[in-house]
Amino acid sequence: MTLVPMVVEPTSRGERAYDIYTRLLKERIIFITGPIEDQMASLVVAQLIFLEAENPEKDISMYINSPGGVVTAGLSIYDTMQYVKPRIATLCLGQAASMGSLLLAAGEKGMRCALPNSRIMIHQPSGGFQGQATDIEIHAKEILNIKSRLNYIYVKHTGRELSEVVASMERDNFMSADSAQDFGIIDKVIEKRLDIEV
């Protein structure tokens, strides 16, 4: 069981308690923490759509500390990030691996940051399948299609050539924050809040 801190705020009717993530959502801050899976992705998508409905002109901040996870769940978040009108600033604290790194790169150009000791990792998608030979062949074709799609998404957001992205994602490719900036996944490494213009 995870302990989530509560924040108590005074109101005209007394005090009101929020869990810390709900309170931060009021400030237009969304957290992506832990493995990316369907339920978590649905919550993030709902938060993005809610914040857009509340104010389509005001920026959203997304803080990422994730080892990655299910590709389709991550792509639902990615597509929603591209779909909504507000600009989305992304910030890696801790790690942004696999789908986490794709979401980090998907932030608004110029607003993608990482803290100095963050670790970013890109790689090709992986999967394991069992069953009849024909079913395995179907799944193998699908994972190759997903690999190709992810490569093009990284090309779009990093500005790298497709051949560079393919070579860089052949195996687990761990990067420091500075290396991720050089690669084009982020725009800036920040040490203090004053270093960021969001």
UniProtKB/Swiss-Prot annotation:
One annotated GO biological process: protein quality control for misfolded or incompletely synthesized proteins
CDD domains in alphabetical order: S14_ClpP_2 (cd07017)
InterPro entries assigned: ClpP (IPR001907), ClpP/crotonase-like_dom_sf (IPR029045), ClpP/TepA (IPR023562), ClpP_His_AS (IPR033135), ClpP_Ser_AS (IPR018215)
Family: Belongs to the peptidase S14 family.
Active-site residues, as the UniProt record annotates them: 98, 123
The entry's keywords: Cytoplasm, Hydrolase, Protease, Serine protease
Protein name (database record): ATP-dependent Clp protease proteolytic subunit
Enzymatic class: hydrolase
Function: Cleaves peptides in various proteins in a process that requires ATP hydrolysis. Has a chymotrypsin-like activity. Plays a major role in the degradation of misfolded proteins.
Cellular compartment(s): Cytoplasm
Catalytic activity: Hydrolysis of proteins to small peptides in the presence of ATP and magnesium. alpha-casein is the usual test substrate. In the absence of ATP, only oligopeptides shorter than five residues are hydrolyzed (such as succinyl-Leu-Tyr-|-NHMec, and Leu-Tyr-Leu-|-Tyr-Trp, in which cleavage of the -Tyr-|-Leu- and -Tyr-|-Trp bonds also occurs)
GO molecular function: ATP-dependent peptidase activity; ATPase binding; serine-type endopeptidase activity
One Pfam entry name: CLP_protease
One GO CC term, this protein: endopeptidase Clp complex
NCBIfam families on file: clpP, PRK00277.1, PRK12553.1
Taxonomy, superkingdom: Bacteria
EC number: 3.4.21.92
Gene name in the database record: clpP
Subunit composition and interactions: Fourteen ClpP subunits assemble into 2 heptameric rings which stack back to back to give a disk-like structure with a central cavity, resembling the structure of eukaryotic proteasomes.
